[in-house]
Structures are given as C-alpha cells and as structure tokens.
C-alpha cells in the first residue's frame, strides 16, 4: 500500500506529465476517491505548488505552465 506522501508525489508527477488531468483520471490512477483528490490538490497548493482547477466539461487539474521543482 502506498503512503499519502507517495501518492502526493505521484499526483505531482502526473500533473507535470500532462496538460490537463481530470479528477476521475487522478482518482483511478492513485486508487483514491474524488474527495481525496481535492484534499491532495489542496495539500500541493499549501506547499506552494501552483495547481489550477477548471470546472465543467473539458475541465480538470494542471500545474501552471512553466512551473518545475
């Protein structure tokens, strides 16, 4: 079983690999529920990582273009 920290790192890698990732794709990839996706996104934002969310059809999450660790 992966730790929450490991899943946060995996989420960051996923967001940096793709221009836009839906909450469902994140949940499926990390084997978590939608609420946990939102909590993890908030955790990354709290660490100063510029994760942006777009609602609605065609929406999803992304790291602001140009950001790299």
Where on the chain are the PLM-derived regions?
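Short, basic/aromatic recognition patches that contact phosphate-bearing ligands
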Residues: 1-69
